[in-house]
């Protein structure tokens, strides 16, 4: 079956992707395109929006089909959820300022679940044999233990239920990071993790990556608790090019999974999800 195109890949008779836009995955993987969408007309891609969930209730419209694509410079550390029309519709509802809160939360929860399941599919499994009710021996696999989740409060807490729906007994830690009123720099106010977090793979949850500063501070806290950046997997829904680049430049070993890279992030996410907009 022909692979579903990336959501930022133009279709039709205009021809295929340019050779310089193609990125090759590491050995054992498949080639795929990672593209940044261009901002909609009238928006500025030079000034990323703040990482906090404060902001206008509206989000930018979808990029113009005529917008020129640009290739990702971030390599294999930035991974996009395979695109299809279902995911595109969920993204559209989340960005639509006229969407009701019920539709918004429903769509966000669905998209979160898809991101979590995609990432769990990349974690280690071991082979096992089970016996069916009819006595048949079935060769299967089982999920390896040793993973945990960490949500960056408050918007990251929206992703906790999606993780628990897939891993009922997984342990989840929390980090609260806010901007200092005087310096406007990210400051850690609260952090609580499983005591053996340094031995676990960490699924760090933060739905909107705008500047990347909040995530960078969170990763620094995890490192202070003995966690290596190479075992941290950042789960997000939307990211700006600036946010993803800032995180990967600071921590080249970290992995980011998101559904879309776009210069304008829906920073109203946390307020609308929790009903405080």
Curated annotation (Swiss-Prot):
Binding residues annotated for GTP, in chain numbering: 101, 110, 144-147, 171, 200
Listed Pfam families: UPRTase (PF14681)
Main location: cytoplasm
UniProt-annotated binding residues for 5-phospho-alpha-D-ribose 1-diphosphate: 154, 206-214
UniProt subcellular location: Cytoplasm; Nucleus
Keyword annotations of the record: Cytoplasm, GTP-binding, Nucleotide-binding, Nucleus
Official protein name in the record: Uracil phosphoribosyltransferase homolog
Annotated organism of origin: Gallus gallus (Chicken)
Organism taxonomic ancestry: Eukaryota, Metazoa, Chordata, Craniata, Vertebrata
Name of the coding gene: UPRT
